[in-house]
Structure formats: C-alpha cells, structure tokens
Amino acid sequence: MQRRRFIGAIAGLAVSLPGTGLDLPAPTGRGAVDPQVIDHFIRLRDALVSADSLLGPGDLVRSASEQVGAIAELYERIELRSRGRLFEVGALFAEFSGWLADDLGDFGTGRAWSSKALEWAHSSGNPDIAAFVLMRMSQQAQFLGERAPAVALAQAAVRYEGQVAGSHVRAAVHQQAAHAAALDGQERAALDCMDRAQALADAAQPTDDPYVLGSYCTSSYVAVQRAAVFSTLGDHRRALDEYDHVMQQWPRSFHRERGLHLARRTVVAARAGLPEAALESGTEALKIARDTQSRRTVRELKTSVGLMLRWRALPSVDEFIRAVTSEGGSGGSAQR
C-alpha cells in the first residue's frame, strides 16, 4: 500500500473515534459511553502499531497522542464494569506515544508518556501492561546512560514474572533484564536472561498477547538483542558475527527496525576496528533512517561517526561522516 493511502486509511479510522468526530451521548454520568468504543480504540492502536514499522513516527505521533486525550476524557463517563479495560487501553496508547517520542529523539516527552502509562497500567490491574511499561522505562533509562535506574526498572519488570500471561511480553522483559545485567558487567546472568528470552520468544503464540504488546519480540528480535548484549560486554567481534547472522534473516515487515539494528552493527564494526564493515551497514542504515524519520537510528549513526573519525582520511569514510553529521540531532544509544 502506498504511504499516502495508508496514512489516509488510518485517518479514516481515527475520525470515527471519541474526540475526533464521533457523536457521543452527552456526559450524563456513568454508563454514558458505549463500551464498544473501547474496541474501536483497540482497532486504531493495532493499525497505528502496524504502520509504525513501515512509516516511522512522524506521521503517527499526533494521532496517537490525540487518542490518549480522548480516552482520558472518557474515564469519568464509562460505566464501572468497563473502566478497568479503558484504563488498559489508555495505558497502551500512552506507552505507544512514548515509543514514538523516543523514536523522534524526544526522550523527555517519551519518559513522561511512560510515567502516565505506568499510572494507568496500575489503575487497570493488568500485570502484562505494567511489566511491559516498566521494561520500556528501563530501556529509556538505558538510552540516557542512567545505569542504576535501567537495572532497577528491569528488575522491577521481572518481579511480575509469575503474573504475566503473555510469552512475548515475558520475552521482552527478560531480554531487557539481559541488557541490565550486561550494564553491570554480569556476563553469565546476561546470557542466561537472553537464553530465557529466546526460549519464550520461540514458544510464543499470538493468543498469548491479545493487545499485541510484545509481538515485536520475535526470535529474530531476541537474537539481535543478544548481539547488542555482547557489544555492551565488550566482545565486539562476537557481536558483529551475531548481527551478520540475524540481519540476513530479518523480516521485511520490520523495515524501520532493520535500519536501527544496521546502525548498531555500524557502531560495533567501528569498535572492532573494521571501517569497511561499518560503512557497509552505515550507508544502508542512513537511507532507512531518512525514509522512516527515525532519530534513534540517526543517534546510533552519530555514535559510529565519533568512532570513525580516525579513518576520515579515507574518502568514503569522510563522505559518510558528512552525510550523518548533516542530519542534525545528538549522539547516543537506544534500545528496542
């Protein structure tokens, strides 16, 4: 489907939702809102999540954040028996808005959305959503180099293990626990967590995750995170081998993520002292970053630029550095 047509289809779905044109009954107290409205919000979120990997965040962030506001307006109007489910959906949209903000490089806004998502997840009583949001907050702390909060939040997510039903969500939680252990230099613990995440991802069924929270946490995703963990542990050559293996089989539907992981491979190749390997993946990653407007990918590429300055006398390296530098923004490293 063409980009413009796809965005138009999403807009057509959004326009029939609360806050965007749907004629709802006047707020006469509890029970004033048809509970089926919740299903409509869920369908819209599913469409936005599907669009995210193909289109990037720029075309979606406004629609997602508008739906959070629309949902919040319904909390006082929805009947009591449906309120918990509405809080679930509000938490899902807030988490997704935070994810989009992160991808645009606005980490302050992303963290604010995650805090709101955690509040609503606790209000809903849904442990899958609460664990997932804590995992995401750990990622955000890791993005910003805040090791202690990243580790503590990952451990908080793991403490939900016995309550979480979704295997994909549990896999996502354990792979982030692996990153946390690697940040603390605990190689054995990190690899054990990654093995657990791999087993969960391999065995996961779609019915385990009705809200499609951790559906991205596939076997391929866990494998590419293993490469990132090796890099954090300082084993850059092994990390590069892992990246090369998994990227050969990367799903086409995760186009934006392909760019992100190629950018991370570029950083690893530079740290391993391999400028040609860094250029190979960096050039493709930059093209995808431009196509999908992913600031996270650009941030990773800017990290690689700092490592590649020693090879700037090579014309191809100099050209790459200039191209990445022209993208603006700041350096840094992010996960998901």
How would you label these PLM feature ranges?
Residues 1-35:
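Compositionally biased, long intrinsically disordered regions
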Residues 29-336:
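Conserved binding/catalytic microenvironments
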